[in-house]
Amino acid sequence: MGKVLTMAMPKGRIFEEAAGLLRQAGYQLPEEFEDSRKLIIDVPEESLRFILAKPMDVTTYVEHGVADVGIAGKDVMLEEARDVYEVLDLNISKCHLAVAGLPGASWGGVAPRVATKYPNVASSYFREQGEQVEIIKLNGSIELAPLIGLADRIVDIVSTGQTLKENGLVETEHICDITSRFIVNPVSYRMKDAVIDEMAQRLARIIEGEETS
């Protein structure tokens, strides 16, 4: 068995898509991999260890070296700005960051309020637009903010738009497209460059094949 590579994976939808991509790339993951309730999963046959983390924490684990590599959404990378290498766009978990609010609602006051779990991204975006806003940090149920008068607008991830629609909100501005990325700890890359390069190349072949098919 070679050097064990530790990979941080986000729990939830991205995890399932990423596991499927790893299998397509030829990694033999156990059948119960996606259904496991463990937070650390060892796959000795592939010299792999997986750490299952909250999506917003993956870049932290990779930056601090407890994981050599990881899979993280571009939204998290933009918000956290961690010291990691972004090696590959995996082209999975496609969505986008957007501004949304109640239809026909006007901006309120001198500094309208914007609720989001991406305060850094939102601040940067509105600064670039030349708009002064007050950012309100929330950790979930962002769509609730305009409905109860907490904020004039929200900045959040939009996938199908169904959640916005169900809450009577409309998208007003498209900020940027989001996909999941293969990221690497800089020190780990110096120590385990061969095995990391192999994983990146195997994943890249699958992605390139899907794009040309």
Swiss-Prot record:
Q: Which UniProt keywords are given for this protein, alphabetically ordered?
A: Amino-acid biosynthesis, ATP-binding, Cytoplasm, Glycosyltransferase, Histidine biosynthesis, Nucleotide-binding, Transferase
Name a single GO cellular component. Answer: cytoplasm
Q: Its annotated pathway? A: Amino-acid biosynthesis; L-histidine biosynthesis; L-histidine from 5-phospho-alpha-D-ribose 1-diphosphate: step 1/9
Per the record's keyword annotation, is Aminoacyl-tRNA synthetase included, yes or no?
no
Instruction: List the PROSITE patterns.
Output: ATP_P_PHORIBOSYLTR
Compartments, record wording: Cytoplasm
Per its UniProt record, what InterPro entries does this chain match?
ATP_PRibTrfase_cat, ATP_PRibTrfase_CS, ATP_PRibTrfase_HisG, ATP_PRibTrfase_HisG_short
Reactions mediated catalytically? 1-(5-phospho-beta-D-ribosyl)-ATP + diphosphate = 5-phospho-alpha-D-ribose 1-diphosphate + ATP
- A molecular function (GO) term: ATP binding
Enzyme class (EC, first level): transferase
Which GO terms fall under biological process for this protein?
Answer: L-histidine biosynthetic process
EC numbers for this chain: 2.4.2.17
What broad class describes the main subcellular location of this protein? cytoplasm
Its family remark reads: Belongs to the ATP phosphoribosyltransferase family. Short subfamily.
NCBIfam families for the chain: hisG (TIGR00070)
Any notes on this protein's domains?
A: Lacks the C-terminal regulatory region which is replaced by HisZ.
What does the record give as the function of this protein? Answer: Catalyzes the condensation of ATP and 5-phosphoribose 1-diphosphate to form N'-(5'-phosphoribosyl)-ATP (PR-ATP). Has a crucial role in the pathway because the rate of histidine biosynthesis seems to be controlled primarily by regulation of HisG enzymatic activity.
Subunit composition and interactions: Heteromultimer composed of HisG and HisZ subunits.
Protein name per UniProt: ATP phosphoribosyltransferase
